């Protein structure tokens, strides 16, 4: 069973550039550019079980360029990798205002043995399959009582900074929400149920790629992007909801093993046809 939401984080009609800095007190061996770095928000729980590498920040003095949240986070990830850190814990953030058009972020960075135990959200990745340990929520006692597990997935959308002279670029994510997703204790050894939930996450990624494709091909500008993005967002959400309903119905929530395997093959094939839109993190 899956609960689904779609969130749009949109449209800064300005231009700005971040100033990167920080203090590295315990540098570690640098990580490769392809190594995943976990980003934890201010409200996300975190207990350090590794080494605090230092502190980093992205600020700005006013109007410049390339400083949407997504762009800033990618620059902070690069700084963390160079210092050997695999976790970024945001300690303070400020939204654009009259003093600055940039997203400003301060964070501590850490090197931990296993970043997965600290995840509150999981961004879809072909090499990162769900485990029951990722289902960190408390099972419901009032709803979904007939299900052994519930997974919660979001599609998230953000644009870069946009001006009359600067065309929009869009960033999309398929996200698994660990603390909203849950599994009942009796189902923790059920590998087939886990495969069913993984396919729900794969369906979310499929429609993220469809959304990314439509956004990239739309050719929006600063004047028409607001309504155009809303239209695509709504349409993709409707399609994905129907696909998930059909998946649950035809597989009988994973109990029909033959149909379950068929759905897994179909979704894997559709993902492959849109592999150019995979998100590298």
What label would you give each PLM region?
Residues 13-15:
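C-terminal motif of bacterial Sec signal peptides marking the signal peptidase cleavage site
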Residues 51-93:
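Short, well-ordered alpha-helical segments
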Residues 122-185, 221-281:
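Metalloprotease/metallohydrolase-associated module, dominated by Zn2+-dependent proteases
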Residues 17-19:
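Bacterial signal peptide processing site
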Residues 2-9, 196:
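Sec-dependent signal peptide recognition
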């Amino acid at each position: 069973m899956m609960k689904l939401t779609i969130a749009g984080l949109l449209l800064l009609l300005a231009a700005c550039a971040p100033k990167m800095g920080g203090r590295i007190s315990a540098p570690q061996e640098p990580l490769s550019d392809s190594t995943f770095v976990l980003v934890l928000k201010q409200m996300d729980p975190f207990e350090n079980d590794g080494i605090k590498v230092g502190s980093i920040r992205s600020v700005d003095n006013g109007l410049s360029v390339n400083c949407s949240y997504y762009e800033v986070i990618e620059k902070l990830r690069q700084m963390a990798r160079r210092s050997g850190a695999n976790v970024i814990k945001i300690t303070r953030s400020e939204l654009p205002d009259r003093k600055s058009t940039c997203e400003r972020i301060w964070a501590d960075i850490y090197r931990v043995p296993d970043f997965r135990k600290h995840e509150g959200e999981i961004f879809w990745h072909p090499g990162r399959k769900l485990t029951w340990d990722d289902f960190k929520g408390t099972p419901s006692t009032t709803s979904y009582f007939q299900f052994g597990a519930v997974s919660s997935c979001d599609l998230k959308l953000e644009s870069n900074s946009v001006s009359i002279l600067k065309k929009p670029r869009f960033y999309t994510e398929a996200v698994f929400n660990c603390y909203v997703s849950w599994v009942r204790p009796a189902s923790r050894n059920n590998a087939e149920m886990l495969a069913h939930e993984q396919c729900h996450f794969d369906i979310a990624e499929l429609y993220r790629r469809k959304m990314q494709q439509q956004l990239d091909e739309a050719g929006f500008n600063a004047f028409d992007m607001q309504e155009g993005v809303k239209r695509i967002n709504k349409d993709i959400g409707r399609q994905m909801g129907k696909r998930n309903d059909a998946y649950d119905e035809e597989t009988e929530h994973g109990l029909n093993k033959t149909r379950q395997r068929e759905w897994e093959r179909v979704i894997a094939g559709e993902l492959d046809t849109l592999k150019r839109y995979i998100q590298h993190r």
